[in-house]
Swiss-Prot record:
Protein name per its UniProtKB record: mRNA export factor ICP27 homolog
Binding site for Zn(2+): C359, H437, C441, C446
Organism: Equine herpesvirus 1 (strain Ab4p) (EHV-1)
Region (Disordered) residue spans: 1-31, 62-204
Amino acid composition bias (Basic residues), ranges on this chain: 94-107, 178-187
Amino acid sequence: MALSSVSSCEPMEDEMSIMGSDTEDNFTGGDTCAEATRGLVNKSAFVPTQTVGTVSALRNVVGDPPKSVVVSFSASPQRAQPSNPKSERPAFGHGRRNRRRPFRRNNWKQQQRGWEKPEPENVPARQSAGSWPKRSSLPVHMRLGQRGGDSSSADSGHGGAGPSDRWRFKTRTQSVARVHRNRRRGNANHGSNTPGRSAGDRLNAAAASSIADVCRRVTSSRIGEMFHGARETLTTPVKNGGFRAENSSPWAPVLGFGSDQFNPEARRITWDTLVEHGVNLYKLFEVRSHAAEAARSLRDAVMRGENLLEALASADETLSWCKMIVTKNLPMRTRDPIISSSVALLDNLRLKLEPFMRCYLSSSGSPTLAELCDHQRLSDVACVPTFMFVMLARIARAVGSGAETVSRDALGPDGRVLADYVPGACLAGTLEAIDAHKRRCKADTCSLVSAYTLVPVYLHGKYFYCNQIF
């Protein structure tokens, strides 16, 4: 029977276009509706090839129209529309109307009107309907993510079976966590380059005039007057006689202001002497408040200008003083001149030892110097330098917090960490660590840094001195 006689089972033109067929070659005969219906199936679709995958072949079956797996709103397909039977383009999957529209930043609602709402069963389990990120002005590669599968596989994604590669970007999948991370990164970069910064970040007229007129304000004669006035101020640093220690006090020679230059060997004492007479100096710091205030200011300035050997000796002085206070069961007052200057001492030691400690700590797998001083964990102590930095950082933190006293627990449980400390260990242990690392490290630059840290003699680094004022 001819195909025209099967009027009740004859496929309509729209139905044929939905099946993706433009001819009637598959309907060569058959007297029944079942035979005509069997002729509607494209048998060649069940033959797998190298270029068309199994999923794409099953999509040609009329009885099972394809369902698109929606991985993002930008990849949602439109409903299949009937097309011209004479057209060579397929009616669904990759039609002209299904091409990706450009993202409209200010017209997102109009772009979303013609799209289907994603079915809950087709949404991936790791991306629920409530976890989709909001649209923003992020770049395309940050919004769309990475490609979902291999371009050579038709089963790797929704658009992998297309006739060309121009739809393959629809297979991109996006992690919600990556979207929010990229958004935070973009906001951080945007915050560092604010649009109004370039307009307002400029010198005002008063500052520009002050910088330009410095050559007229400062001359060589005025420089001489500055130094002369500074010397006069230092001749009488403290009023009311200073600490006014008794002549019989063992601390009388060291409590004067500007009497003699500091000589470490001339002022060397033993640990037993410090334990015996240290309480007298402790009380003088507490009673003579005006002298103690001047002592704090001057000692803070001295700590910042010391060389490495002097700074290490000051570290031993600070820890020995704290150990004496713990031994005598006295409160460690933060207004004590020796304890108060621990902040300046720590800054100077970090400045002097930072180049060496960078390689020294990394070679042993220890935390960086900044992490040691910030975290201040006793578990990070592995040698004398790390012990020195952790203990000074704990004392400096208490001083900087504004507390009246330093807690005994800051020096370990009930201050027992200093029980094994021997006065002079900071100087001897740090010098030993520098020399041992210098012999062990193979890097040439590290050898130079270690040697210059021990012997800071000028070899190279300064290239010119330019001064057109005086």
